[in-house]
Amino acid sequence: MLVKSTTRHVRIFSAEVQGNELIPSNNVLTMDVDPDNEFVWNEDALQQVYRRFDELVESYSGEDLTDYNLRRIGSDLEHFIRDLLQAGKVSYNLDCRVLNYSMGLPKVENQETAGKYWLDN
Protein backbone atom coordinates (compact mmCIF):
# COMPACT_ATOMS: atom_id res chain seq x y z
CA MET A 1 0.00 0.00 0.00
CA LEU A 2 1.31 3.45 -0.91
CA VAL A 3 1.70 5.73 2.10
CA LYS A 4 2.43 9.38 1.35
CA SER A 5 2.87 12.85 2.77
CA THR A 6 2.49 15.99 0.70
CA THR A 7 3.50 19.44 1.92
CA ARG A 8 4.06 22.58 -0.12
CA HIS A 9 7.73 21.82 -0.79
CA VAL A 10 8.19 18.14 0.12
CA ARG A 11 6.46 15.02 -1.14
CA ILE A 12 7.31 11.70 0.49
CA PHE A 13 6.12 8.32 -0.81
CA SER A 14 6.56 4.78 0.49
CA ALA A 15 7.62 3.73 -2.99
CA GLU A 16 10.55 3.50 -5.33
CA VAL A 17 10.75 5.07 -8.76
CA GLN A 18 11.00 2.69 -11.70
CA GLY A 19 10.91 4.52 -15.00
CA ASN A 20 8.25 7.17 -14.45
CA GLU A 21 6.21 4.98 -12.10
CA LEU A 22 6.00 4.86 -8.31
CA ILE A 23 6.04 1.25 -7.17
CA PRO A 24 4.73 0.88 -3.58
CA SER A 25 7.31 -0.43 -1.11
CA ASN A 26 7.43 -1.04 2.62
CA ASN A 27 11.23 -0.70 2.61
CA VAL A 28 11.92 2.42 0.54
CA LEU A 29 10.92 6.07 0.95
CA THR A 30 11.17 8.43 -2.01
CA MET A 31 11.25 12.19 -1.56
CA ASP A 32 10.55 14.93 -4.11
CA VAL A 33 11.91 18.30 -2.97
CA ASP A 34 10.32 21.53 -4.23
CA PRO A 35 8.28 19.97 -7.04
CA ASP A 36 7.00 23.38 -8.17
CA ASN A 37 10.51 24.90 -8.38
CA GLU A 38 9.61 27.71 -6.00
CA PHE A 39 13.24 28.01 -4.88
CA VAL A 40 16.66 28.30 -6.47
CA TRP A 41 18.76 25.47 -5.05
CA ASN A 42 22.48 24.86 -4.97
CA GLU A 43 23.80 21.34 -4.56
CA ASP A 44 24.99 21.91 -0.98
CA ALA A 45 21.56 23.08 0.22
CA LEU A 46 19.83 20.19 -1.53
CA GLN A 47 22.23 17.71 0.07
CA GLN A 48 21.49 19.25 3.48
CA VAL A 49 17.79 18.52 2.94
CA TYR A 50 18.56 14.92 1.93
CA ARG A 51 20.78 14.45 5.00
CA ARG A 52 18.08 15.90 7.26
CA PHE A 53 15.55 13.55 5.63
CA ASP A 54 17.83 10.57 6.36
CA GLU A 55 18.20 11.69 9.99
CA LEU A 56 14.44 12.04 10.43
CA VAL A 57 13.74 8.67 8.83
CA GLU A 58 16.34 7.07 11.10
CA SER A 59 14.71 8.67 14.15
CA TYR A 60 11.49 6.80 13.27
CA SER A 61 13.27 3.46 12.91
CA GLY A 62 11.12 0.73 14.43
CA GLU A 63 7.93 2.83 14.23
CA ASP A 64 5.00 1.87 12.03
CA LEU A 65 5.03 3.36 8.53
CA THR A 66 1.94 5.59 8.75
CA ASP A 67 0.62 8.72 7.06
CA TYR A 68 0.98 10.50 10.38
CA ASN A 69 4.68 9.68 10.78
CA LEU A 70 5.41 10.71 7.19
CA ARG A 71 3.51 13.99 7.73
CA ARG A 72 5.66 14.70 10.78
CA ILE A 73 8.82 14.13 8.73
CA GLY A 74 7.44 16.33 5.93
CA SER A 75 6.53 19.08 8.39
CA ASP A 76 9.99 18.98 9.97
CA LEU A 77 11.54 19.26 6.51
CA GLU A 78 9.34 22.28 5.70
CA HIS A 79 10.73 24.02 8.79
CA PHE A 80 14.26 23.02 7.77
CA ILE A 81 13.75 24.50 4.29
CA ARG A 82 12.42 27.72 5.85
CA ASP A 83 15.61 27.89 7.95
CA LEU A 84 17.70 27.48 4.77
CA LEU A 85 15.73 30.29 3.12
CA GLN A 86 16.13 32.61 6.09
CA ALA A 87 19.87 31.83 6.22
CA GLY A 88 20.20 32.74 2.53
CA LYS A 89 21.22 29.22 1.47
CA VAL A 90 18.28 29.02 -0.96
CA SER A 91 16.31 31.83 -2.53
CA TYR A 92 12.96 32.31 -4.21
CA ASN A 93 12.86 31.47 -7.90
CA LEU A 94 11.57 34.68 -9.48
CA ASP A 95 10.88 32.76 -12.71
CA CYS A 96 8.53 30.37 -10.90
CA ARG A 97 5.10 29.77 -12.40
CA VAL A 98 3.44 31.47 -9.41
CA LEU A 99 5.16 33.78 -6.92
CA ASN A 100 3.36 33.27 -3.64
CA TYR A 101 6.24 33.63 -1.14
CA SER A 102 4.84 30.74 0.88
CA MET A 103 7.71 30.94 3.38
CA GLY A 104 7.41 34.70 3.92
CA LEU A 105 8.27 37.82 1.96
CA PRO A 106 11.87 38.16 0.77
CA LYS A 107 14.07 40.42 2.84
CA VAL A 108 16.19 42.88 0.89
CA GLU A 109 19.16 44.55 2.52
CA ASN A 110 19.21 48.32 2.04
CA GLN A 111 22.28 50.24 3.23
CA GLU A 112 20.32 53.46 3.74
CA THR A 113 17.82 51.90 6.15
CA ALA A 114 20.00 49.28 7.84
CA GLY A 115 19.53 49.52 11.60
CA LYS A 116 17.01 52.39 11.37
CA TYR A 117 13.41 52.07 12.39
CA TRP A 118 10.58 54.50 11.75
CA LEU A 119 7.50 54.90 13.86
CA ASP A 120 4.42 56.54 12.42
CA ASN A 121 2.84 58.95 14.91
Curated annotation (Swiss-Prot):
It holds the Pfam family NdhM. The keyword Membrane applies. Its EC number is 7.1.1.-. InterPro entries: NdhM. It is a peripheral membrane protein. It catalyses: a plastoquinone + NADH + (n+1) H(+)(in) = a plastoquinol + NAD(+) + n H(+)(out); a plastoquinone + NADPH + (n+1) H(+)(in) = a plastoquinol + NADP(+) + n H(+)(out). Signal peptide: none annotated. Keywords: Membrane, NAD, NADP, Plastoquinone, Quinone, Thylakoid, Translocase, Transport. GO terms for cellular component: plasma membrane-derived thylakoid membrane. It comes from the Bacteria. Its main location: membrane. GO terms for molecular function: oxidoreductase activity, acting on NAD(P)H, quinone or similar compound as acceptor; quinone binding. The keyword Translocase applies. It is found in: Cellular thylakoid membrane. NDH-1 shuttles electrons from an unknown electron donor, via FMN and iron-sulfur (Fe-S) centers, to quinones in the respiratory and/or the photosynthetic chain. The immediate electron acceptor for the enzyme in this species is believed to be plastoquinone. Couples the redox reaction to proton translocation, and thus conserves the redox energy in a proton gradient. Cyanobacterial NDH-1 also plays a role in inorganic carbon-concentration. NDH-1 can be composed of about 15 different subunits; different subcomplexes with different compositions have been identified which probably have different functions. Belongs to the complex I NdhM subunit family. PANTHER family: NAD(P)H-QUINONE OXIDOREDUCTASE SUBUNIT M, CHLOROPLASTIC. This is NAD(P)H-quinone oxidoreductase subunit M. It comes from Synechocystis sp. (strain ATCC 27184 / PCC 6803 / Kazusa). The gene is ndhM.
